[in-house]
């Protein structure tokens, strides 16, 4: 029987939940013996049979964004944890009957991969909300969740985790490919071939998060179609100031979040209009992407960049990145043929966590120490188990 795993993902854009039912024909290979098998065959090595996006109601999104900015007290944070658990269970409901297992990333509201003495923080920490027991109770399925802490306990940054699934599903011999995610935060996975020890991945900086903040100031959920940015002009002094941010000088492995990339922490003239602010944020995001490739990936040899995430549907942002990366080809999941298997810019992250959950069920290590900086790989994810596992996972 073909394993079927339902991945649930709500990213740093906090716009809603992607539920992707990942089918894995041919997994696990015969005789894998509990050790992750060598990759073979064409890509992708899986397909998304069904996908449902459930948007957050405005009041839930506002609460999530407030938690990201440390704007909730302990009682409100506890309420939000259960509210998100209910939302995840509801998002899973249409597809759960077809799944053997559910893998839930949860909603990251705080991620501090390194101690910060300036704030009196002496240890790394991360927090993903969304009570898993609610998902298990309402779907009747085993659930794997809370993937990041195991890597951090092993000395890693707890991110990025998606690159393990990128490697398993998309790595191809003879092709030096990067998969770039433009979610709330921008990150890349560099796949130089089939060897997982050569995979490189890191956060490059903001993705959609600054643009979403500008859009919110304009009374919009996002800069739909990049129209706000297209109506403005880049403010060169502000762009230069932002590009001097010390976070951009940190070499990989590195992870970042909205707590770093927010307008509240970036200087700008008080009279800068919203269209110009959007244009500047777009140019800044594109430059941080291009600079990351130029410094840390292109020197190793790179054939193409395949873009995913909500930012892939922003024409202004995509055009700015394409121009900044030139002459490197920038392609979409549709253009490389993966969308025909249901793997699109919208489903990639949910499918990735579905695969991480599947690997956890197999007992495989599902992290890449080179990308997170951990001392060793771990089998990440916490279980909420039913009395017995489905046949396809046992």
UniProtKB/Swiss-Prot annotation:
Residue numbers binding ATP: 11-18
Recorded superkingdom: Bacteria
Positions of disulphide bridges: none
Pathway(s) per entry: Amino-sugar metabolism; 1,6-anhydro-N-acetylmuramate degradation; Cell wall biogenesis; peptidoglycan recycling
Catalytic function, reaction form: 1,6-anhydro-N-acetyl-beta-muramate + ATP + H2O = N-acetyl-D-muramate 6-phosphate + ADP + H(+)
GO MF term (any one): ATP binding
Keywords in alphabetical order: ATP-binding, Carbohydrate metabolism, Kinase, Nucleotide-binding, Plasmid, Transferase
EC number in record: 2.7.1.170
Pfam families xrefs: AnmK
Annotated InterPro entries: Anhydro_N_Ac-Mur_kinase (IPR005338), ATPase_NBD (IPR043129)
Gene Ontology BP terms: 1,6-anhydro-N-acetyl-beta-muramic acid catabolic process; amino sugar metabolic process; peptidoglycan turnover
NCBIfam families, alphabetized: PRK09585.3-5 (NF007150)
Family: Belongs to the anhydro-N-acetylmuramic acid kinase family.
Function description: Catalyzes the specific phosphorylation of 1,6-anhydro-N-acetylmuramic acid (anhMurNAc) with the simultaneous cleavage of the 1,6-anhydro ring, generating MurNAc-6-P. Is required for the utilization of anhMurNAc either imported from the medium or derived from its own cell wall murein, and thus plays a role in cell wall recycling.
Name of the protein this chain belongs to: Anhydro-N-acetylmuramic acid kinase
């Amino acid at each position: 029987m073909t394993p079927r795993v339902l991945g649930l993902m709500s990213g740093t854009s906090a716009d809603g939940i992607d539920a992707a039912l990942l089918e894995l024909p041919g997994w696990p290979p015969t005789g894998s013996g509990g050790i992750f098998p060598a990759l073979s065959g064409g890509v992708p090595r899986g397909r998304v049979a069904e996908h449902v996006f459930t948007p957050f109601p405005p009041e839930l999104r506002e609460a999530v964004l407030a938690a990201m900015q440390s704007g909730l007290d302990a009682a409100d944070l506890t309420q939000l944890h259960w509210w998100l658990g209910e939302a995840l269970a509801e998002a899973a409901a249409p597809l759960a009957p077809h799944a053997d297992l559910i893998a839930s990333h949860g909603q990251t509201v705080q991620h501090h991969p390194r101690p910060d003495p300036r704030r009196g923080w002496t240890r790394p920490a991360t927090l993903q909300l969304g009570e898993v027991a609610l998902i298990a109770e309402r779907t009747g399925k085993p659930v794997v969740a809370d993937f990041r802490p195991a890597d951090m306990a092993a000395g890693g940054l707890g991110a990025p985790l998606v690159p393990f699934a990128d490697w398993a599903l998309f790595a191809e011999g003879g092709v030096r490919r990067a998969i770039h995610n433009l979610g709330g935060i921008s990150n890349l996975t560099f796949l130089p071939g089939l060897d997982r020890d050569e995979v490189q991945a890191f956060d490059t900086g903001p993705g959609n998060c600054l643009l979403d903040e500008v859009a919110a100031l304009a009374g919009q959920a996002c800069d739909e179609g990049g129209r706000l940015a297209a109506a403005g002009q880049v403010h060169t002094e502000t762009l230069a100031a932002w590009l001097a941010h010390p976070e951009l000088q940190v070499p990989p492995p590195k992870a970042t979040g909205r707590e770093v990339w927010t307008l509240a922490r970036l200087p700008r003239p008080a009279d800068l209009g919203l269209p110009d602010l959007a244009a500047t944020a777009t140019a800044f995001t594109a430059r941080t992407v291009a600079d990351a490739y130029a410094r840390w990936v292109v020197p190793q040899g790179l054939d193409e960049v395949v873009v995913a995430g909500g930012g892939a549907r922003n024409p202004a942002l995509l055009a700015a990145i394409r121009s900044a990366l030139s002459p490197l080809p920038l392609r979409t999941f549709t253009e490389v043929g993966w969308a025909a298997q249901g793997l699109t810019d919208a489903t990639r992250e949910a499918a990735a966590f579905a695969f991480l959950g599947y690997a956890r069920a197999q007992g495989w290590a599902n992290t890449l120490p080179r990308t997170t900086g951990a001392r060793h790989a771990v089998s990440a994810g916490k279980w909420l188990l039913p009395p017995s596992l489905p046949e396809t996972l046992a």
